[in-house]
C-alpha cells in the first residue's frame, strides 16, 4: 500500500454541480484559503463540467473560468491549482489560457472508452510542461481489459498520471481493486495512478482505500463531500481514516474539518446526502451530475426523478448527454398520459 498520497480537492469544481455553478468569487477565495491553510496540495477550479463548460446544455456560471482561476491563484501560499478539460467542451485555447495564468495541472477527461479523443489536448499540455492527467470517466461501464487499453492510450499520448473515475458512485471496493490493480500493473512504474469517487452508495472512503491499496497515489475528495449526486468522497473523513491507518496526506484533520463545517456547509443550497435519488444514481450506475437535471424534469413533467434516473441507467447514457434527460422525461410522461401529443 502507498504510504503517502496526494489529496486533490474537488470542492470548487465538482462542488459547482450542486451549486448550479453559482459559487461567488468571495466564496471561492474563502474556501481556497481554508484548503491551503489545511495543507491540501492540489485544488481543482473550473465550471463543474470543466473549462468551457458554460453553455445552455451544462449551465451558465456566475463567473468565467478565468475569473475563478485568477481569484483562487491569488490566494494560495502552498497549494497548486488544477483544471478539468473535456475534449469537445474545452478547447486547446482554454488549455493555453489556464497555463498562461498559472494552472499547474490539467486533467483531460473522456468517457472510459473514448481515450482517443484526448490525444491533442494531452499532447499540448505535455508540450507546455504541465502536470498532465488522463481521466477516464464512468469506469464501471467498461470491462477491465478495455480500461487497461484506454489508460495505455492516454499514457502513450503523454499523460504522466491516469485516473480511474467512478462518476456514478456505482463501484464497490472489489471493483476498484480489480480495475485499478490491472491498470497499475499495465502502466509504466513512473506513471501515477489516481482515483475519483462519488458517495452515492456511501463507498467513497472505502473505495479510496481500495485504490490506495492498489498503488493509487492521487485521491480526489471534497470538503463536506460537496459534489455531484451524494457528493464526492468527504475529505475530512478520508484524512482522519488515513491518519489512523498511517497513510500520510499532509492535511491537518482538524483544519479540514473546520473548512467543511464553517465554510462549505453554509453555502450548500441543499444537504449533500444520500437521498433516494442520489442512491438511485449509484444503484443504477448513472452519471452523478445528472441528479439536478432529473429533479428539474420531475418538477416540470411530474415523473419521479428516481424513475427518470432508472431509465437513463437502462439506456446507458453518459456524461455529455444531458439534453437526453428532458427527452426521456417527456417520453415517460407521454406514455403515462401526462402530456398531450
Curated annotation (Swiss-Prot):
The keyword Ribosomal protein does not apply. Its EC number is 4.1.3.39. It is an enzyme of class 4 (lyase). InterPro entries: 2-IPM_HCS-like (IPR050073), 4OH_2_O-val_aldolase (IPR017629), Aldolase_TIM (IPR013785), DmpG_comm (IPR012425), DRE_TIM_HOA (IPR035685), PYR_CT (IPR000891). The keyword Iron does not apply. Keywords: Aromatic hydrocarbons catabolism, Lyase, Manganese, Metal-binding. Residues 5-257 form the Pyruvate carboxyltransferase domain. Pfam families: DmpG_comm (PF07836), HMGL-like (PF00682). Substrate binds at residues 13-14, 167, 196, 287. One of its GO terms (biological process) is catabolic process. GO terms for molecular function: 2-isopropylmalate synthase activity; 4-hydroxy-2-oxovalerate aldolase activity; manganese ion binding. PROSITE patterns: PYR_CT. The active site is at 17 (proton acceptor). It catalyses: (S)-4-hydroxy-2-oxopentanoate = acetaldehyde + pyruvate. NCBIfam families: 4OH_2_O_val_ald, PRK08195.1. Belongs to the 4-hydroxy-2-oxovalerate aldolase family. This is 4-hydroxy-2-oxovalerate aldolase 3.
Amino acid at each position: 500500500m502507498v504510504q503517502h498520497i496526494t489529496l486533490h480537492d474537488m470542492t470548487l469544481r465538482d462542488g459547482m454541480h450542486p451549486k448550479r455553478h453559482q459559487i461567488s468569487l468571495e466564496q471561492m477565495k474563502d474556501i481556497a484559503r481554508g484548503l491551503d491553510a489545511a495543507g491540501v496540495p492540489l485544488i481543482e477550479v473550473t465550471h463543474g463540467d470543466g473549462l468551457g463548460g458554460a453553455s445552455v446544455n451544462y449551465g451558465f456560471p456566475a463567473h468565467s473560468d478565468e475569473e475563478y482561476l485568477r481569484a483562487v491563484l491569488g490566494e494560495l501560499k502552498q497549494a497548486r491549482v488544477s483544471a478539468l478539460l473535456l475534449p469537445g467542451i474545452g478547447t486547446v485555447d482554454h488549455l493555453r489560457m489556464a497555463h498562461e495564468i498559472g494552472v499547474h495541472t490539467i486533467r483531460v477527461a473522456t468517457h472510459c472508452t473514448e481515450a482517443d479523443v484526448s490525444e491533442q489536448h494531452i499532447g499540448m499540455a505535455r508540450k507546455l510542461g504541465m502536470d498532465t492527467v488522463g481521466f477516464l470517466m464512468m469506469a464501471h461501464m467498461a470491462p477491465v481489459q478495455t480500461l487497461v487499453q484506454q489508460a495505455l492510450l492516454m499514457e502513450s499520448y503523454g499523460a504522466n498520471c491516469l485516473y480511474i473515475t467512478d462518476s456514478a458512485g456505482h463501484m464497490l471496493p472489489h471493483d476498484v481493486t480489480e480495475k485499478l490493480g490491472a491498470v497499475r500493473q499495465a502502466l509504466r512504474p513512473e506513471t501515477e495512478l489516481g482515483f475519483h469517487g462519488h458517495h452515492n452508495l456511501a463507498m467513497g472512503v472505502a473505495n479510496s482505500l481500495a485504490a490506495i491499496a492498489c498503488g493509487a497515489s492521487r485521491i480526489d475528495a471534497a470538503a463536506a463531500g460537496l459534489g455531484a449526486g451524494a457528493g464526492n468522497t468527504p475529505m475530512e473523513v478520508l484524512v482522519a481514516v488515513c491518519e489512523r491507518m498511517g497513510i500520510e496526506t499532509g492535511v491537518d484533520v482538524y483544519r479540514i474539518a473546520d473548512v467543511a463545517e464553517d465554510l462549505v456547509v453554509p453555502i450548500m443550497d441543499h444537504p449533500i446526502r444520500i437521498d433516494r435519488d442520489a442512491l438511485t444514481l449509484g444503484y443504477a450506475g448513472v452519471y452523478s451530475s445528472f441528479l439536478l437535471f432529473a429533479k428539474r424534469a420531475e418538477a416540470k413533467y411530474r415523473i419521479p426523478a428516481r424513475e427518470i434516473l432508472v431509465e437513463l441507467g437502462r439506456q446507458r447514457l453518459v456524461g455529455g448527454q444531458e439534453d437526453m434527460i428532458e427527452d426521456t422525461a417527456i417520453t415517460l410522461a407521454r406514455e403515462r398520459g401526462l402530456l398531450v401529443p
